[in-house]
Curated annotation (Swiss-Prot):
Mg(2+) binds at S266, T286, D359. This is Dynamin-like GTPase MGM1, mitochondrial. Residues 170-183 have a biased composition (Gly residues). Residues 249-522 form the Dynamin-type G domain. It comes from Chaetomium thermophilum (strain DSM 1495 / CBS 144.50 / IMI 039719). Belongs to the TRAFAC class dynamin-like GTPase superfamily. Dynamin/Fzo/YdjA family. Cleavage of the transit peptide by mitochondrial processing protease (MPP) produces a long integral membrane form of MGM1 (L-MGM1). Further processing by the rhomboid protease PCP1 produces a short peripheral membrane form of MGM1 (S-MGM1). Both forms are required for full activity. CDD domains: DLP_1 (cd08771).
Length: 939
C-alpha cells in the first residue's frame, strides 16, 4: 500500500465520525472499478487529498481524537503528482498524433488508387471508342462498295426501289403541289435508312453487331432478308390456320423441341430468344406444351411477351413471364402431371428471328416417388402427338451422353426414320474433349439430313459480388461460344465441316422452317380452297348468305326487346295498376274483418267460452251498440294506417318486374343468362330509385282519409256490389281447403268423425283434459289437429255465407247502416284509397319507368358487353348464333389466308429478279410460282 493510500485510510475514520454527527450535511460514496495502473492510483490519491483539506470540521476532529498521521508529507507527494499529471496528457497527445498520421496515410493511398483507376478507365474508354469508330467507318465503306457492286450486277425491282426512295407509302409523291425549286412537283424524298438498312435487316438476327464484320455478300444479305420476310408471312398464315380450327387437314409446320430433362433443352430455347424466361427447378416443371411464337419487330423499343389466351399484353419483365409460366404449369394436378392443353406465348423483339417453336415436357427414364407410374407413357404420347409430320423436330442431346441412349433421337427415328425433318442439337460441348465433340457433330452412325449443331447454351457460373446481366444473354453466350470454338480451330473451324453456335442454329432453324413451310404451301393452298368452297356452300344453304356479327346480333335482340316493351307499355297503365292495388287492399280488408268479426280460433279441445257479441247476431244488434261501433272504427283505422303508400309502390314495382321477366322469357335474351340478369337488374334499379318518393307522396295524399274516409252513396253502392264477389271468392277458398283436408285424412267420413268429436268436446259433452301427444277419443294428435282445422273452416264458411246474404239484403242498401255492413264500408274505403294512390303511381313511378328503363338497359348492356370480351361471349351463348358466327369467321379467315398467299406470291415474284436466275427458280419452286404455261401451280 502506497503512502497516499495509507494517508487516506488514516483520515477516513475521523471523517466518518464527523460526518455521522448532527452537523453532517452530505455523505460521499466513492466506487473504484478496474484499477488500471498509475493513472487510476493518481486519481485516488488526489481524491483522498481533497477530502483531507476540504472540510473544516476535520481540524476539530484531529484535536479531539489525537490521531497522529505520520506519512502525510506533501513534499514527497506533490512532485510525483505533478510528474504523473504531465505523463497523462503526453500519452493522449502521442496517441492522437499517431491516429492523425495513420488517417493521412490511408487518405493518400486511396487518392493514389482513385487516380490510377480513373486513368485506366479513361484509357480503356478512349481505346474502345476509337476501335468502335474505326470499325464503323470500315463497315460503312465496305457496305457502300458492296452495294455499288450489287447495283451494277443486279436489277433492283420497282417495289424495292420505291422503298429506298421513300415512295413506298400510299399518298406520298403523287401530289400536284408546288414544292419543287421551280414551282413544279416536289422531287421524291430519299430514304434516310438507305441501302444499308434494307440490306442489313437480318444482321441483328444473325448476330452481326457494330463491331463484327458481316462477311455475307450482298446477294446473301438480300436472300436472308427475303427469307425472313417470307417466314414472317408464313407464320402469320399458320396462326390464321390455327384459328380456323382445321389442324388435321390444313396446317403448316412448326419446330417441336424435344429432349430429356437433363439435356439442356430449356437453355437452348432461352439462348435462341436471348432471355431467361422458362421455369427452372430440379423436378419436372414443364407440364403443358408451350407454343412459342417469336416475332421479329424492328419497331419494338424493348423486348416483351404476350399471353393471348390470358389477355396479358406487353409484359417487358421476363421474370414475370417465367413466374406466369410456372404458375400455369403448376395448375396441372399432381395426379395428372401432364396435359395437352397448350400455353401460348408470343415474344416480340428486334433481335430474334420469326420462328414458331413448341416446347414439350422432357423425357424421363423413371417416374419419381410422388409421380404416377404412367407419367413416362403420358410424356411419350404427348411428344409423339406433336412430332408428327409436317412439324420440324429439334432433337436436343447432351454431348456428355452417348447418342445411342438419346431419347430425343430415338423418338425422332420412330416418326422420321430418314431424318429429313430432324435437326440434332448437341449441348454442353465444353464438357467433352474437342475431338470427341467434333466426332459427335460429324456422326455417321445416326445421320440426319439437316445435320447437327453444337452449342454451349448455358454460361459458366460467374463468381464475385456482381451477377451477370441477363438482359444481354445472347451476346454473352455468343461471346462464350466464340471463345471456346475459336480456341479449337482444327475441330470447329470453318474448314472442319461442322456447325457450331447458337447463331448458326438460329439461321438453320429459320432456313429449315421457311423451306418446310414453302414446300407445304401448295398442298395447304389446295386444302384451303376446298375448305373455302365447302364453307361458302354451307353458308349459302344454311343461312342464305345472311351476314351476322356479335354487334348486329345484340342490336337485333335489343330492338326486338324494345318493341315488345313498347307494346307492354301501351297496354299497362293506370287502370291495370288500380286493379292490382285494389286486389291487394281487398286482402287487407279480409284480414281486418277476420281479426275483428270472423275469427273463432280453436286452440284445444276445452269447452268454448260464450261470446256476448256474435257476428251472427249483428243484423239484430242495437244500432248504437258501442261494441260494434268500436269494431268498425278500429278496422277502418287499421286499413287506412297500414302503410298504403309502401304497399302501392311494392305492388306496382312487383307487377312491372314480373312483366319485364315475361318479356325476357319471350325474347332472345332468354338464352343469355348474363344479359338477362343485366336487364332485370336495370329494371329493379329504376323501380327502386322511385319507390321511396312514390310511397311518400301517396302517404301525404291519403292523410285526410285517415281521419274521415268521406264515403259517398255511389261509392257505397259500388262497394256493396264488389264485396259480394270478394266474399264469394273467400268462401270458395274455404271450401277448397276443406276438400284438401278430406283427402289428407282418408275421406269425408273419417273427417266428419273427427269433427264430431271436436264439436262434442267444445260443447262440453266430452271432457278432454289437456292436449295429449297420444291423442284422445281413439284419434291421434295429428288427426285431432286436422279436425280442429276442419271445424274452423266450416265455421268460417258458415259466417261467409251469412255475410254474403247480409250484403245482398235491404239492410246494407244505404250508407246509414254501415255498422251493420262492415264489409261494404271497408271495401268502399279500400276503393277510395286505391283510386287516390294510383294517381301518384302512374305519374311518379310508371311513366318515369317507361322513359328511363330503355336508356338504362342500353347503358348497362354496353358496360357489360365491353368488359372482358362480353360481346363475343354473349353472342356465342346461343348455339344457333354460335354456329352462324363460326361459319362466317371460318369463311373470312380462309379468304384472308388465300389473300396472304396471293400477296406472298406477288412479293416473291418481285424479289426473284434480285436473287439471280438460280435463286429465283428456287424461290418460285418453294412458294408455288406460276408455271411456264402462265397458270399458278396451286390455283
Amino acid at each position: 500500500m502506497s503512502a497516499q493510500l495509507r494517508a487516506a485510510a488514516a483520515i477516513t475514520p475521523a471523517a466518518r465520525r464527523v460526518i455521522s454527527g448532527p452537523a453532517a450535511v452530505r455523505r460521499f460514496h466513492h466506487y473504484h472499478h478496474l484499477p488500471t495502473g498509475g493513472i487510476q492510483r493518481v486519481e485516488i490519491a488526489a481524491r483522498g487529498l481533497r477530502r483531507s483539506v476540504q472540510f473544516p470540521a476535520l481540524a476539530n476532529a484531529y484535536h479531539n481524537n489525537a490521531v497522529i498521521v505520520r506519512n502525510a508529507s506533501f513534499t514527497r507527494l506533490l512532485p510525483k503528482l505533478a510528474l504523473k499529471f504531465i505523463r497523462v496528457p503526453a500519452l493522449f497527445g502521442g496517441m492522437m498524433l499517431g491516429a492523425v498520421g495513420w488517417v493521412q496515410y490511408q487518405a493518400i493511398k486511396v487518392s493514389n488508387s482513385a487516380q490510377e483507376f480513373y486513368g485506366n478507365i479513361k484509357a480503356t474508354v478512349a481505346d474502345t471508342a476509337f476501335s468502335v469508330w474505326s470499325s464503323a467507318v470500315d463497315i460503312a465503306e465496305q457496305t457502300k462498295r458492296g452495294w455499288e457492286n450489287t447495283k451494277n450486277q443486279f436489277e433492283i425491282p420497282e417495289w424495292l426501289d420505291r422503298i429506298m426512295k421513300g415512295e413506298g407509302l400510299a399518298g406520298e409523291g403523287s401530289g400536284s403541289g408546288e414544292g419543287g425549286p421551280n414551282g413544279g412537283p416536289e422531287p421524291p424524298r430519299q430514304s434516310r435508312a438507305g441501302a444499308a438498312t434494307v440490306a442489313g435487316a437480318s444482321a441483328t438476327v444473325y448476330g452481326y453487331g457494330a463491331s463484327d464484320n458481316d462477311d455475307r455478300t450482298p446477294e446473301e444479305i438480300m436472300r436472308d432478308d427475303n427469307m425472313m420476310f417470307i417466314t414472317k408471312k408464313m407464320i402469320e398464315i399458320r396462326n390464321l390456320l390455327q384459328k380456323v380450327g382445321q389442324g388435321s387437314t390444313v396446317t403448316l409446320p412448326s419446330i417441336v423441341v424435344i429432349g430429356s430433362q437433363s439435356s439442356g433443352k430449356s437453355s437452348v430455347l432461352e439462348a435462341i430468344v436471348g432471355h431467361e424466361f422458362l421455369p427452372k427447378g430440379s423436378n419436372m416443371i414443364t407440364r403443358r406444351p408451350i407454343e412459342l411464337t417469336l416475332v421479329n419487330d424492328p419497331e419494338a423499343k424493348v423486348d416483351y411477351g404476350e399471353f393471348p389466351d390470358l389477355g396479358l399484353a406487353r409484359v417487358t419483365d421476363f421474370s414475370l413471364i417465367q413466374k406466369t409460366l410456372t404458375e400455369l404449369n403448376q395448375s396441372v394436378p399432381e395426379s395428372e402431371c401432364v396435359t395437352d392443353d397448350p400455353i401460348r406465348l408470343t415474344i416480340h423483339s428486334p433481335n430474334i428471328p420469326d420462328l414458331s417453336l413448341i416446347d414439350l415436357p422432357g423425357y424421363i427414364q423413371v417416374a419419381g416417388e410422388n409421380q404416377p407410374r404412367e407419367l413416362k407413357r403420358k410424356i411419350t404420347e404427348l411428344c409423339d402427338k406433336y412430332i408428327r409430320g409436317p412439324n420440324i423436330i429439334l432433337a436436343i442431346s447432351a454431348a456428355d451422353t452417348d447418342l445411342a441412349n438419346s431419347t430425343a433421337l430415338q423418338a425422332s427415328r420412330r416418326v422420321d426414320p430418314r431424318g429429313e425433318r430432324t435437326i440434332g442439337v448437341i449441348t454442353k460441348m465444353d464438357l467433352v474433349e474437342p475431338e470427341k465433340g467434333a466426332a459427335i457433330l460429324s456422326d455417321r452412325q445416326y445421320p440426319l439430313k439437316l445435320g447437327y449443331v453444337g452449342v454451349i447454351s448455358k454460361l459458366p457460373p460467374q463468381s464475385g459480388l456482381f451477377r451477370r446481366d441477363t438482359g444481354n444473354l445472347l451476346a454473352s453466350i455468343n461471346r462464350n461460344e466464340k471463345n471456346y470454338f475459336g480456341s479449337h480451330p482444327t475441330e470447329f473451324g470453318p474448314d472442319s465441316g461442322v456447325s457450331t453456335g447458337v447463331m448458326t442454329l438460329r439461321k438453320k432453324l429459320l432456313q429449315v422452317l421457311e423451306q418446310q413451310m414453302s414446300s407445304k404451301l401448295n398442298e395447304t393452298t389446295e386444302a384451303i380452297q376446298r375448305e373455302l368452297e365447302e364453307t361458302t356452300y354451307q353458308f349459302k344453304v344454311q343461312y342464305n348468305e345472311q351476314p351476322m356479327s356479335a354487334e348486329s346480333y345484340l342490336a337485333a335482340s335489343l330492338d326486338d326487346f324494345k318493341h315488345q316493351f313498347h307494346e307492354f307499355a301501351s297496354s299497362f297503365g293506370r287502370p291495370q295498376l288500380q286493379t292490382l292495388l285494389k286486389d291487394a287492399l281487398d286482402q287487407k280488408v279480409l284480414d281486418q274483418l277476420a281479426a275483428r268479426y270472423w275469427n273463432r280460433p280453436i286452440e284445444d279441445l276445452s269447452p268454448a267460452p260464450r261470446e256476448p257479441d256474435n257476428i251472427i247476431d249483428l243484423p239484430k244488434a242495437d244500432p248504437d251498440s258501442p261494441y260494434w261501433h268500436r269494431q268498425l272504427d278500429t278496422a277502418c283505422s287499421g286499413l287506412t294506417r297500414l302503410g298504403v303508400g309502401r304497399l302501392a309502390a311494392t305492388v306496382a314495382a312487383s307487377a312491372i318486374q314480373q312483366h319485364v321477366e315475361k318479356l325476357l322469357d319471350k325474347s332472345s335474351f332468354a338464352k343469355h343468362p348474363s344479359a338477362r340478369k343485366v336487364i332485370s337488374d336495370a329494371a329493379a334499379t329504376v323501380l327502386a330509385d322511385r319507390s321511396y318518393a312514390t310511397s311518400d307522396g301517396i302517404e301525404i295524399s291519403l292523410k285526410p282519409y285517415k281521419f274521415d274516409p268521406d264515403i259517398q252513396p255511389n261509392e257505397w253502392a259500388q262497394g256493396r256490389e264488389h264485396v259480394v264477389g270478394v266474399l264469394q271468392a273467400e268462401l270458395e277458398q274455404c271450401q277448397a281447403a276443406m276438400k284438401a283436408l278430406e283427402n289428407s285424412v282418408g275421406g269425408r267420413k273419417k273427417l266428419k268423425e273427427v269433427m264430431s268429436f271436436v264439436d262434442k268436446a267444445r260443447k262440453g259433452e266430452i271432457i278432454v283434459e289437456g292436449d295429449h301427444p297420444s291423442g284422445a277419443g281413439g284419434f291421434s294428435a295429428a288427426l285431432l289437429a286436422r279436425g280442429r282445422e276442419a271445424v274452423f273452416l266450416r265455421d268460417r264458411a258458415d259466417i261467409l255465407s251469412l255475410r254474403i246474404q247480409a250484403a245482398k239484403s235491404r239492410q246494407c242498401k244505404t250508407l246509414t247502416n254501415k255498422y251493420y255492413c262492415p264489409e261494404v264500408f271497408l271495401d268502399a274505403v279500400a276503393t277510395k284509397l286505391a283510386q287516390t294512390a294510383v294517381l301518384f303511381l302512374n305519374v311518379e313511378m310508371l311513366n318515369d319507368f317507361y322513359v328511363r328503363f330503355p336508356r338504362e338497359v342500353e347503358a348497362k348492356l354496353h358496360e357489360h358487353m365491353h368488359a372482358g370480351g362480353g360481346l363475343e361471349k354473349f353472342a356465342r351463348e346461343d348455339p344457333k348464333v354460335r354456329r352462324h358466327l363460326d361459319l362466317i369467321r371460318r369463311k373470312e379467315l380462309l379468304e384472308t389466308v388465300l389473300g396472304k398467299i396471293e400477296e406472298l406470291h406477288r412479293i416473291s415474284s418481285g424479289t426473284a429478279g434480285t436473287l439471280g436466275l438460280r435463286g429465283a427458280g428456287d424461290l418460285k419452286k418453294r412458294i408455288g410460282a406460276p408455271s411456264s404455261s402462265g397458270r399458278r401451280s396451286f390455283f
